[in-house]
Structures are given as C-alpha cells and as structure tokens.
Amino acid sequence: GVGRAAAAAAAVAVPLAGGQEGSPGGGRRGSRGTTMVKKRKGRVVIDSDTEDSGSDENLDQELPSLAKRKRSDSEEKEPPVSQPAASSDSETSDSDDEWTFGSNKNKKKGKARKIEKKGTMKKQANKTASSGSSDKDSSAESSAPEEGEVSDSDSNSSSSSSDSDSSSEDEEFHDGYGEDLMGDEEDRARLEQMTEKEREQELFNRIEKREVLKRRFEIKKKLKTAKKKEKKEKKKKQEEEQEKKKLTQIQESQVTSHNKERRSKRDEKLDKKSQAMEELKAEREKRKNRTVELLAKKQPLKTSEVYSDDEEEEEDDKSSEKSDRSSRTSSSDEEEEKEEIPPKSQPVSLPEELNRVRLSRHKLERWCHMPFFAKTVTGCFVRIGIGNHNSKPVYRVAEITGVVETAKVYQLGGTRTNKGLQLRHGNDQRVFRLEFVSNQEFTESEFMKWKEAMFSAGMQLPTLDEINKKELSIKEALNYKFNDQDIEEIVKEKERFRKAPPNYAMKKTQLLKEKAMAEDLGDQDKAKQIQDQLNELEERAEALDRQRTKNISAISYINQRNREWNIVESEKALVAESHNMKNQQMDPFTRRQCKPTIVSNSRDPAVQAAILAQLNAKYGSGVLPDAPKEMSKGQGKDKDLNSKSASDLSEDLFKVHDFDVKIDL
C-alpha cells in the first residue's frame, strides 16, 4: 500500500511541474499544487516509516532492503553536491536580473526549475523507500532528470548568459517593459484591475526605476570602453618599450663587439711589443757573451769591430729606449682612457642626446667674434651640408675638432669673417665655412650614419658625461659677462673684416691726427703707414663716389642729348611748315591767326572819300568843312588832321552806322 501511494504522489507531482513550465500565467496555481503534493507525499512517507517500524514480523525481510537503501543513498548523495551551488547561482542571477533587462522571464524559469528539482528529490526518496515498485514507477523515474544532471534549460540559460556578456557592448537598454511601461498580457491585466491612482503610482515607480537602470547601463558601458582604451594604450606602450629595449640591446651589442675588437687590437700590439723586447734582450745577452769571450782570449780588437759594435749598441740602446717610451706612452694612454671612461658612463644612443650639444648657424654667427669661441665650440657637433643628391640637400653629423682661419673673407648673416670649422666624420676630416652649417636638428638616419662611420673607423662614441660637461660649457658661454678688454677685441675683430669704415670723414680725421702725432714724435715709419692708409681710404672713397654717380652722370648725359635733338627737330618742323604754307591753297575752313582791324581806321582813300560823300549828302556839307581841303592836299602832309577827323568819326559810332539800305526783292 505504501509503494502504490508513493507512485501515485510522484505521478501527480510530475504533470504539475510540467504545467508550471509550460503555462506562462499559471505560476501561483502550479506552486500551490506542488506544495499540496509535497505535504501528501511527506505524510505518506512518514506513515510508511511508522508502519514499518511498528511491525516486528517483517524485520528479517526488510534487512536486505535497508542495505539497498544505503547503497542507493550513497550513490545519490554525491551528485547533489553541485546542485545547491547551481540553485544558489540561479537565485543570485535571478536577484541580479531584477535590476537588469529580462527579469520577469528569468523569474518564471527559476521557479519552474525549483519545482522540478523538489519533485525529483521526493521521487527518489520514495523510490528508496519502496523496494518493490512497478514498471510504471521505473518508467516515470527514468523520464525525470536525476539530481546530478543539468537540464536543457540550465544549459541554454548559461549559454545565453555567456552570449549576453560577449555582446553586452552591442546591446541596447531594455528593462522588460515596452515604451508604454507595460509588460506582457498578465502585467497589462493586473494594471487594468488596479485603480487609476494605483496604476499611475506604479507607472511612476517604473519610470524612476528605468532612469536608474539607464544610468547604470550607461556607466557600465563607459567603464567598459575606458577599460578597452586603457588596454590598447598599455599594449602600445608595451610594444614601444619592447622596441626601445631591442634597439638598446642592439646598440649595446654593437658597442660590446666594438670594445672587444679594440681590446683584441691592443692585446696584439702588446704582444708585438713584448716580443720585440724579448728579442732585444736576447741580442744584448749574446753581445755580452761575445765581449766576455773576447776578453778571455785577450786578443786585440779591430777598430772597425769596436766602433761598429759601439754604434750598433748605441742604436740598440736608442731603439730600446724608444720602445720603452712607446710602451710607457701606450700604457699611460690606456690608463688615461681607463680613467676617462668610468664604468657607469654610457655612450650616446639617441639623436636627442646628441642634439643637446648641437650648434646652429645662428649661434655661430653670434659667437664668431667672441673671445671664447674656439674654446666653447671644440667638442660640439654640427649638422653640415655636404652637397646635393638628386636635387636634395645631403647633411652629415660632424664633430668640431678645431677653429681655423681661411683665406677667403665671406658674409655670415649680418657680419663678415674668415673663420672655418675643422670637422670630423669618422676618419674623414675637412674644413668647412660657417655658412654651410644647418639650423635644423639631427635626424634618425643621419645619426645612424654617423654611428656606422664611427664604428667602421674604430672610434669610441661620446659618453653622456662628456655631453653633460659640454652642455654646461655652452650654458656658461650664453651667460658670459664681458669686460672692457673683451669688447675692444670684439671691435677690432669686426673692423678687420669690414670693407669700408662706416664714416669716411671721421676715419680720415683720426688718421690725420695719428699721422701728426707720429711726425711730432719723429716716427717716420708709422707716419708712412698712416699715409698709406689715408691713400687707400681716398681711393675707396673715390671708387664709391664713382660708383654712386655713375648712374647719375649717365642719366644727365641722356637728358642733354635728348634736349639738343628736340631743338634740331623743332627747327626742321618749322621750316617744313612754312614751306607748306606757301605752297598751300586757300582753305576757307582752316583757322588762321589774324588780328581784327576797325573799318573806320582803314587807310584806303577811295573808300574814305565815298564814306565822306555819303555823310555830306545826308547830313549836309557843314559837318565836315575841312574835308575837301584835306583830300586835295597830299596824304603824307596832313596825316595828323586826317587822323583827328577819322578819330572824331570813329568815336560817334551811332552816326557812322545811321544810314538806310534799300533792298529790292
């Protein structure tokens, strides 16, 4: 009876759990059904236990069944160890999902899983209690999952969580509700059952919750992007550091190989010197033995042998002394090199380090006349132009080994100088003018080219200590304080290379004063030198004057020539015009130059007589009583009277023009 009751309880529990998973809206009913089944199953198990314990008759029969129970319990206790962890994980994930998107669905799935697990636990307990179960019970147990197994829903949820983690950056914010702040149909039905106030309050709470979740989602997204950027930057920094380390390792290996080569060469030189010393010692011992043998025999020696031996001994002594000196100097040089190169000093490895002691053309232009120029410049580096290649300028890194004076005086910016720099690039040395120095910094390719030249020449690179010292000397030169003597030297240096003095008159007066003082002191040589300077100054002034007035005189000559030519041409034009006027016919439309003459002042006697006759006929003969007498007399005798009468008539213009004209039409 107990076995049948347990089987029936298990059969009731399984469909209830399946209904819980399948129906989205039947959460409460499913949970109630499962709790009722649990209570009934518990009661059945307890009753069966009490009945089994109370009956003493079937103890012998139940002993083997108890052994089977222990075995099955020991087998089934091992897998459930992982089950609580999974359930706890699901519970924590569910609790976290309440603050993330898709929380309602996960809750329902979690409840369904819990109900399934409880049902299976109780089924297996009933299975162990009842030893003689039927085939139906075994089929039901085989259909349900065991405690150690993971269901498909769990695996799907784990895979979906991993996918959500991987694609969390691409996902958009979703809190389980739509744009109208409502969920599925069940949620809509529940909101419809509420009052309007409760519904508004619920929607307001959901809005606040959505804002909080949005902020958290954006913060997480920003943090993830920031972490990604940091990782990328760290990777870049690590790659750059690795590249720098590789470069330094390569340079160190080159330096070490170079040092090994130098040491091997020094060892070879020392071996050669030691061999030569041993040979000299052996020769001396042989000569000593010879002299001892000769003295023992007491034979007279020839002069040639004696002198030749002495000369040879002297030569040998000199050669031995020279070899000793050379060995001492070489050893002293090695000791000095060892002292100069401390163990902590490192050679230059970057162009930025060498740029600290680089001199530009602007600095050289400022310092070329300074008293500290040669001392400060030696040991510094410059970027010198050596020519063009494929129409592009080529530059090299070179070290300044000295300052010399060239034969050519050239223009350097605003000053003139004849100084040149003795530069060294590897084994090559050459003198360059200051105007070929560049103002730009060293490039990486130029720096590597210089290093290769130094290594091939077997020369050592400058150390950082030397660069620091030279940098300090450059700073001291920039902050140099001049005294009176320095200023006088600078002025003399600048005057040496000036083509002409700034003021010829002042220079001439100064030279004349110096000449007068020299003549007073009786120094004729100095007076002669000053006179030569004066003559040279006069020649320069005359040359400048000629050069200045050269263009002016040429222009004035051209102007005078043009004036003379214009005069000649104008005279020719006047002659031609007068000739044309004579031969030209009268043209009434041409304008002519003429002066107007008054009709009354005309000198024609016939016209004048006609006018007088008309006037007498009109106004009577008493108007002009003297007219016939004047007409009868000669024109030359009575000019004054005639002019007076004419002037009287001309004055009364109204009378002159007061006459009638008859026109017949």
From Swiss-Prot:
Swiss-Prot/TrEMBL domain comment: The Plus3 domain mediates single-stranded DNA-binding.
Assembly and binders: Component of the PAF1 complex, which consists of CDC73, PAF1, LEO1, CTR9, RTF1 and WDR61. The PAF1 complex interacts with PHF5A.
Superkingdom classification of source: Eukaryota
Composition skew (Basic residues), residue ranges: 105-125, 223-235
Localization in the cell: Nucleus, Nucleoplasm
One MF term in the entry's GO annotations: single-stranded DNA binding
Function field: Component of the PAF1 complex (PAF1C) which has multiple functions during transcription by RNA polymerase II and is implicated in regulation of development and maintenance of embryonic stem cell pluripotency. PAF1C associates with RNA polymerase II through interaction with POLR2A CTD non-phosphorylated and 'Ser-2'- and 'Ser-5'-phosphorylated forms and is involved in transcriptional elongation, acting both independently and synergistically with TCEA1 and in cooperation with the DSIF complex and HTATSF1. PAF1C is required for transcription of Hox and Wnt target genes.
Native organism: Pongo abelii
In-chain residues carrying the UniProt-annotated modification Phosphoserine: 48, 621, 645, 650
Compositionally biased region (Gly residues): 19-28
Disordered: region residues: 1-208, 223-352, 622-647
Residue numbers of Phosphothreonine PTMs: 50
Membrane-crossing residue ranges in chain numbering: none
GO CC entries: Cdc73/Paf1 complex
Keyword entries, A-Z: Activator, Coiled coil, DNA-binding, Nucleus, Phosphoprotein, Transcription, Transcription regulation, Wnt signaling pathway
UniProt xrefs under Pfam families: Plus-3
Gene that encodes it: RTF1
Composition bias type Low complexity, residue spans: 1-14, 153-165
Residue ranges of domain Plus3 in the record: 348-479
SMART domains: Plus3 (SM00719)
UniProt name for this protein: RNA polymerase-associated protein RTF1 homolog
Lineage: Eukaryota, Metazoa, Chordata, Craniata, Vertebrata
Coiled coil regions, renumbered to chain: 521-555
Start-end of Acidic residues biased regions: 48-60, 307-318
GO biological process: endodermal cell fate commitment; negative regulation of transcription by RNA polymerase II; stem cell population maintenance; transcription elongation by RNA polymerase II; Wnt signaling pathway
Biased composition (Basic and acidic residues): 187-208, 236-246, 264-286, 627-642
